[in-house]
Amino acid sequence: MTDQMFGLDGRVALVTGASSGLGAEVARTLAAAGARVAVAARREDRLAALADDLGGVAVACDLLDPAQVDTLVSRVTERLGGPEILVNVAGGFAGACPAEEEAPATVSDTLTLNLVAPFRLCQTAFPHMVAAGRGAIVNVSSISGQVGIPGIPQASYAAAKAGLSGLTAELAVQWAPHGIRVNTVAPGFFRSEITESLYDDERSHAWLRRNTPLPYDAEASDIVGAVLWLAGDAGRYVTGQTIVVDGGWTAR
């Protein structure tokens, strides 16, 4: 029964932002569940090594380049077949900056990377999921799209991640008749290349621990269970939701 609920039985899955951190962990988890995984990111050397480990395929893609985004799904389809699972992990922001000082180019790039590119990938994956009669899209957001975080000003990033939850709800309603589910996972703070400095600094680490009810630090492995649940049949009646995985941060 458990294998039926969480097994992905040869379904093609595309994971963006997969060269390291959460994206790589998601790719490993889906592959372990039986998916045939295509990994996409800018860092092609890391990507190739991961794809070899998983028995999948690597496709280099810069999500700030619309031409590369528009062809990513077709490049995956040529090598593995059309994706039935899409996990939009890639994202990020230029750095903490007061809203009134954010440069227009920075705002544009942040919105493109975190919202526009995932939307476009959903659009290009859509016909393949329709043809398969089913599909699961999991967008990876952040608690920054749910609440403001004092001391870490990131307005354009917060706007993009909040927009991702709105996009998720809208696509879920539009595409439900095709058997396509669309959900978002919104992680809180967890150890990664990007956040390591927060954990290495005694003061910021104490701040994280003080504001997180669960009494331990999270790793990427603490986030991927929600993604696997939403990607497979265990979550077959869940759509349009933003699942917050934050150790209780937003429940305070």
Language-model regions, residue ranges each:
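A conserved structural motif in NAD(P)-dependent oxidoreductases
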Residues: 212-223, 234
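Short, small/polar-rich loop/turn modules that mediate ligand/substrate recognition or access, typified
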Residues: 176, 181, 238-240
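Short C-terminal tail/terminal secondary-structure segment
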Residues: 2-5, 93-96, 228, 239-252
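Conserved glycine-rich cofactor-binding loop
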Residues: 19-20
